[in-house]
């Protein structure tokens, strides 16, 4: 720490302030840990996703084969894929439980309205990550689920038809749909989620945790 302090003056005070920041006594229960557990699942998703990206091939011809290779041939591949799969399921559940806790305790009220909005965006991003990742194995179930998702998007007023074409890569389902979902899943959506997470935690830090009901 001294070495860092010499090169970045003040970093020691920042680290000490973060480490020694008092936590209200009413937050010392599992219901106030749901947000942190959601973040933990997101970190697991990122780490296991990087490992899976080493072997995954986002083409219609090779996608399913590469997933099978990860599961059956790569050392610990089945474990890593299972961790990615189940941490996704758990993250979605925890996001909903976290938002229910925030709503029940009134933590979304003034002056924390913007943090609630950021949390709503994070919920949408979590669902979008789950949806885009579902197509990547490119099996029958995931393929038709994605087609249904595109048709559902088509029902949106004004932007629906355009959004469907953007998702599918054309009037009909094309190979570009897989590559677009892959880019969304591994690059765009995680980057946007990280931005909202940083904003979310900064607002928590500045505004503090809400008082008990």
UniProtKB/Swiss-Prot annotation:
Residues engaged in binding heme b 1: 98, 200
Signal peptide: none
Record field: transmembrane: 30-50, 88-108, 114-134, 184-204
Keywords from the named record: Cell membrane, Electron transport, Heme, Iron, Membrane, Metal-binding, Photosynthesis, Transmembrane, Transmembrane helix, Transport
Residue numbers binding heme c: 33
Subunit structure, interactors included: The subunits of the cytochrome bc complex are a Rieske Fe-S protein (PetC), cytochrome b6 (PetB), subunit IV (PetD), and a diheme cytochrome c (PetX).
Cystine pairs: none
Family according to the record: Belongs to the cytochrome b family. PetB subfamily.
Pfam family, one: Cytochrome_B
Additional detail: Heme 1 (or BH or b566) is high-potential and absorbs at about 566 nm, and heme 2 (or BL or b562) is low-potential and absorbs at about 562 nm.
Any one Gene Ontology BP term: photosynthesis
Task of the protein: Component of the cytochrome bc complex which donates electrons to the photosynthetic reaction center.
Listed GO MF terms: electron transporter, transferring electrons within cytochrome b6/f complex of photosystem II activity; metal ion binding; oxidoreductase activity
Cofactor annotation remark: Binds 2 heme b groups non-covalently with two histidine residues as axial ligands. Binds one heme group covalently by a single cysteine link with no axial amino acid ligand. This heme was named heme ci.
Gene, per the UniProt record: petB
Localisation: Cell membrane
Keyword Transport tagged: yes
Listed cofactors: heme b; heme c
InterPro entries the record matches: Cyt_b/b6_N, Cyt_B6_PetB, Cytb/b6-like_sf, Cytochrome_b_N_euk/bac, Di-haem_cyt_TM
Protein known as: Cytochrome b6
Membrane topology: Multi-pass membrane protein
Residues that, per the record, bind heme b 2: 84, 185
Gene3D superfamilies in the cross-refs: Cytochrome Bc1 Complex, Chain C
